[in-house]
């Protein structure tokens, strides 16, 4: 692994310890991390790291989802690292930009990992996103603002997200992880 990314490598090792059933996925993330110096740049056309937020309410009972304009589906806030190897900071920045919720804070270590294909669009070829997800908690103010990347935003009960077959499998997985963690 390149010596300038040891922090993410250590965070991935910690995640593997906490989620031993995801060894293969963590290994794929580590191989990708070591593959090229530009893995945090969207210009790296094979794929790149992204940071996302599992944005929960102050009481932890609800999650804020966005209906993504380009992908036309409900997702968690998140986006490109744009050269920033500190993916928790990326997740927080994207949550703030995409929701407008004030007083957000990142909690703890990596919460979830997801590797998924992004379809070709315009001059951008199909590519991989290596998405590193963190819990981001709202404070008392849960008011949101819809920006140009979203068609809608909605607070949803985590327990409902876990069982909603119309939602992306990774959202349901994160909801189940959250429910197990907060029983």
Predicted feature locations:
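Short, low-complexity, intrinsically disordered N-terminal peptides in bacterial proteins
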Residues: 1-7, 180-183
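Hydrophobic alpha-helical segments that drive targeting, anchoring, or assembly
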Residues: 54-55, 81-83
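N-terminal strand-loop-strand
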Residues: 40-76
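Charged phosphate-binding loop/patch that engages nucleotide di/tri-phosphates or the phosphate backbone
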Residues: 166-183
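Generic N-terminal amphipathic, Lys/Arg-enriched alpha-helix
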Residues: 4-16
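Unchanged
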Residues: 82-170
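Acidic, metal-coordinating catalytic segment for phosphate/diphosphate chemistry
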Residues: 14-52
């Amino acid at each position: 692994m390149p010596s300038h990314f040891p922090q993410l490598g250590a965070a991935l090792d910690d995640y593997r310890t906490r989620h031993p059933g995801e060894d293969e996925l963590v290994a794929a993330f580590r191989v990708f991390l070591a593959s090229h110096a530009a893995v945090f740049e969207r210009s790296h056309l094979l794929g790149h790291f992204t940071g996302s937020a599992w944005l929960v309410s102050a009481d932890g009972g609800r999650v804020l989802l966005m209906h993504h304009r380009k992908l036309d589906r409900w997702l968690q806030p998140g986006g490109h690292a744009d050269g920033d190897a500190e993916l928790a900071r990326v997740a927080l920045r994207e949550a703030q930009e995409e929701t407008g919720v004030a007083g957000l804070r990142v909690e703890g270590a990596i919460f979830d990992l997801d590797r998924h294909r992004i379809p070709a669009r315009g001059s951008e070829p199909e590519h991989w996103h290596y998405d590193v997800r963190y819990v981001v908690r709202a404070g008392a103010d849960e008011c949101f603002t819809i920006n140009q990347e979203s068609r809608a935003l909605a607070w949803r009960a985590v327990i409902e997200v876990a069982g909603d077959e119309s939602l992306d499998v990774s959202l349901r997985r994160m909801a189940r992880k959250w429910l197990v963690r907060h029983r």
